[in-house]
Amino acid sequence: MASARNLLLLSSSRLHGHGYLEHARGQLEDLFKSANVKTVLFVPYALRDHDKYTATVRDALQPWGFNVEGLHTKPDREQALREAQAIFVGGGNTFVLLRSLYEMKLLDPIRELVLQRGLPYVGSSAGTNVATRSIHTTNDMPVAYPPSFEALALVPFNINPHYLDPEAGSRHKGETRDERLEEFVAYHGLPVLGLREGTSVRVQGEKAILLGDRNAKLFKADGGTEELAPLADLTFLLQK
């Protein structure tokens, strides 16, 4: 059965020179309007202050015509998800977010609603990490201990949000981002998409495309790498 996926996976909510979510406004509007979304259910669990975080997202989306409600305010979270028009899983600490989703038993309902019923899903940073098969390629400190690194698996590959290129001439002797991602590939034999700031992945059913004005870097399962230009067809990454 074909997937009903309707996803927008952002590298980040903030981009230098832009207001909160401003760089992704057109992408968000396209996604929400395609599904006639008027109210977005925000999942704030990647940060500690859920009320403040939800208010930040509300302040960004309301002027564009979208209401925002916080999942944390709902007495029955699973029912709220089932009644939602769209969900937005915000960034922050990926380990904290995933542990919260496990503790609240929300992984299975989200997975079902997104993959089988086509519930629009927006992820940013940590929210993008948990949308992938696992959180192994997050940049975050493991300040919390989820039961597993396995995540929602809305897409069958890994993403590294906030991807940074190695700095030419750097005197830093620690591992580069590339070396860490290459290590993951060596152990797991799975591809990782490095999303630079301002880029995102749009998934509609069995098709995916790279959005934004910068390249993404693909770390291939065989150990090679490839630069992918804006509007590149990423559908091949959806093949399990």
Swiss-Prot record:
- The first-level EC class reads hydrolase
List, alphabetically, the GO terms of the cellular component aspect: cytoplasm
Q: Does Cytoplasm appear among the keywords?
A: yes
Keyword hit for Protease: yes
List the active-site residues.
Answer: S125 (charge relay system), D140 (charge relay system), H162 (charge relay system)
Task: State which Enzyme Commission number(s) the record gives.
Answer: 3.4.13.21
Localization, UniProt: Cytoplasm
| Origin: domain of life | Eukaryota
Task: List the molecular function annotations (GO) for this entry.
Answer: dipeptidase activity; serine hydrolase activity; serine-type peptidase activity
Q: Which InterPro entries match?
A: Class_I_gatase-like (IPR029062), Peptidase_S51 (IPR005320)
Q: Which keywords describe this protein according to UniProt? A: Cytoplasm, Dipeptidase, Hydrolase, Protease, Serine protease
NCBIfam families attached to this UniProt entry:
PRK05282.1 (NF003642)
Query: Tell me, what does this protein do in biology?
Result: Hydrolyzes dipeptides containing N-terminal aspartate residues.
Name by which UniProt lists this protein = Probable alpha-aspartyl dipeptidase
